């Protein structure tokens, strides 16, 4: 989809760049595939902030997405492509031959009227879902499972994809956008193609208020705080913090590795760049 620029008739329109959504469905989502979602304001069940700078934002309905694609060997037709406020990718409403509706992540070049299927014998066609053992090397994939039957977890954001680069000893080797090479069981499923809305990375919100609509509050720098609030705080006049950058709890930031999951490190063939 193309990007949309605006004439600067107001200051906030001068820098505004949006994705053109004219080809998307303009009505409401399918009610049976939505549910309410409550705001947390970045707080956990104890009321403490666990995700800073969150709060407010427009009210949303959560669209129930089928990441598992468990309806095997039943063909479905794409009814429409929709906007989803809960993610950067677009979603597709599909109708199976038995009459059931479902939402899936919409890959690039999927259009209304196309047929998709989840099957071991499916064609290598955009939107089809197959086990990795049935997919030829070199194929571009998205919504890749990490555990058999858990549902897709890798490459679900706008414009993302992974490449299948090898198969060996019961595992498929995939290359992620980060440059990481990872092993995934061959029985895990993946969908053909890359995710829709690749221009998401080029948008410009144009004003602070548009970020507030998305649920983001102002991001306050540590050097602008008091010493009680942040290790960089305080000082007479404007100061630079006086130390290497740290988090509010005093741990080094800006590049320090924070990954703790040693249990799955054996599946990482090559670390990300």
Curated annotation (Swiss-Prot):
One of its GO terms (cellular component) is large ribosomal subunit. It comes from the Bacteria. Residues 254-273 have a biased composition (Basic residues). SMART domains: Ribosomal_L2, Ribosomal_L2_C. Residues 228-273 are annotated as: Disordered. SUPFAM superfamilies: Nucleic acid-binding proteins, Translation proteins SH3-like domain. InterPro entries: NA-bd_OB-fold, Rib_uL2_dom2, Ribosomal_uL2, Ribosomal_uL2_bac/org-type, Ribosomal_uL2_C, Ribosomal_uL2_CS, Ribosomal_uL2_dom3, Ribosomal_uL2_RNA-bd_dom. Keywords: Ribonucleoprotein, Ribosomal protein, RNA-binding, rRNA-binding. One of its GO terms (molecular function) is structural constituent of ribosome. Signal peptide: none annotated. Part of the 50S ribosomal subunit. Forms a bridge to the 30S subunit in the 70S ribosome. NCBIfam families: rplB_bact (TIGR01171). This is Large ribosomal subunit protein uL2. It comes from Rickettsia africae (strain ESF-5). The lineage of its organism: Bacteria, Pseudomonadati, Pseudomonadota, Alphaproteobacteria, Rickettsiales.
């Amino acid at each position: 989809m193309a990007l949309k620029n605006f004439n600067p008739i107001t200051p906030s329109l001068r820098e505004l760049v949006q994705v053109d959504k004219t080809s998307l469905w303009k009505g409401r989502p399918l009610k049976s595939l939505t549910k309410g979602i409550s705001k947390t304001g970045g707080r956990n069940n104890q009321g403490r902030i666990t995700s800073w700078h969150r709060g407010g934002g427009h009210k949303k309905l959560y669209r129930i997405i089928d990441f598992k694609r468990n309806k095997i060997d039943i063909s479905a037709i794409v009814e429409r492509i929709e906007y989803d406020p809960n993610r950067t990718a677009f979603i597709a409403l599909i109708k199976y031959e038995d009459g059931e509706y479902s939402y899936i992540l919409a890959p690039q070049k999927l259009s209304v009227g196309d047929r998709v299927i989840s099957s071991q014998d499916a064609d290598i066609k955009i939107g089809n879902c197959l086990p990795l053992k049935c997919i030829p090397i070199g194929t571009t994939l998205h919504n890749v499972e990490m555990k058999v039957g858990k549902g897709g977890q890798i490459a679900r954001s706008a414009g993302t994809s992974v490449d299948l680069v090898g198969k060996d000893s019961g595992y498929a080797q995939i290359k992620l956008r980060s440059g990481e090479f990872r092993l995934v069981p061959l029985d895990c499923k993946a969908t053909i193609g890359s995710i829709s809305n690749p221009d998401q990375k080029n948008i410009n919100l144009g004003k602070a208020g548009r970020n507030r609509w998305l649920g983001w509050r102002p991001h306050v720098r540590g050097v602008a705080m008091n010493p009680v609030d942040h290790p960089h705080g305080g000082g007479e006049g404007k100061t630079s913090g006086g130390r290497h950058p740290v988090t509010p709890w005093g741990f080094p930031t800006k590049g320090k590795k924070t990954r703790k999951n040693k249990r799955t490190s054996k599946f990482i063939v090559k670390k990300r760049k």
